[in-house]
Amino acid sequence: MAQNDTVKLIGCSDDPFSIRPRVALHLKSIKYEYLEEPDDDLGEKSQLLLKSNPIHKKTPVLIHGDLAICESLNIVQYLDEAWPSDPSILPSNAYDRASARFWAQYIDDKCFEAANALTGANNDEERIAATGKLTECLAILEETFQKSSKGLGFFGGETIGYLDIACAALLGPISVIEMFSADKFVREETTPGLIQWAVRFRAHEAVRPYMPTVEEVTELVKQRIEEGFKRNFKSNVSTSEYE
């Protein structure tokens, strides 16, 4: 596959995972066309998305020539291998590379599982359990940052790397959870490294154009809640016995 083949990215501004390939594309200075996909709950999925990702039918999807690559972490790895010139995203050392992949999967499996459990909690017991689990996950991630950064600014050391990009998907959801709950999960006493990392990461030139602010994410969530309420109201009215 030639590097000069057309590159497109199907993403969604509401999807926290879509930021991962956008940061990677920016770091690699790859020219591409960005195709905004409507929110899953607000509109029909495009035919291009359904054709490109027929299994999960979700963003993001990278289209390189006539090839479609799905899943955000998989896309980032593909970009690093298909465009091997500097800067490298994955570590060059085999052990460090395997470790970065392990912790990236930990973020998607454990951290997001805890975050989703908290937002979907139906009672105080479930909320307390999910709060404890998310706190534990972030404490482990803090420890991982301290070890992998080696006293430098990013998980990847001096520069943004694979694990930084993986962790980027957490920033929006955690900010929203903190905004709508009484809990503070990223705080100086327990996650000082992650706090400073988030500030540096958001300010990076490869991140800033694609990472919404906390206020923007919160406003978007409020808008989605309002739109969901309106849709449910219209649906209930149209199916009532008075129709």
Swiss-Prot record:
Chain's role: May be involved in the conjugation of reduced glutathione to a wide number of exogenous and endogenous hydrophobic electrophiles and have a detoxification role against certain herbicides.
Domain (GST C-terminal) ranges: 93-220
Main enzyme class: transferase
Catalytic activity, EC: 2.5.1.18
SUPFAM superfamilies registered for this protein in UniProt: GST C-terminal domain-like, Thioredoxin-like
Source species, domain of life: Eukaryota
Entry protein name: Glutathione S-transferase U14
GO-annotated molecular function: glutathione transferase activity
Species for this entry: Arabidopsis thaliana
Record PROSITE patterns: GST_CTER, GST_NTER
GO terms, biological process: glutathione metabolic process; toxin catabolic process
Entry similarity comment: Belongs to the GST superfamily. Tau family.
One Pfam match: GST_N
Entry GO CC: cytoplasm; cytosol
PANTHER family linked to this entry: GLUTATHIONE S-TRANSFERASE U13-RELATED (PTHR11260:SF632), GLUTATHIONE S-TRANSFERASE, GST, SUPERFAMILY, GST DOMAIN CONTAINING (PTHR11260)
Residue intervals of the GST N-terminal domain: 5-87
Residues at which glutathione binds: 15-16, 44-45, 58-59, 71-72
Claim: Thylakoid is one of the keywords in the record: no
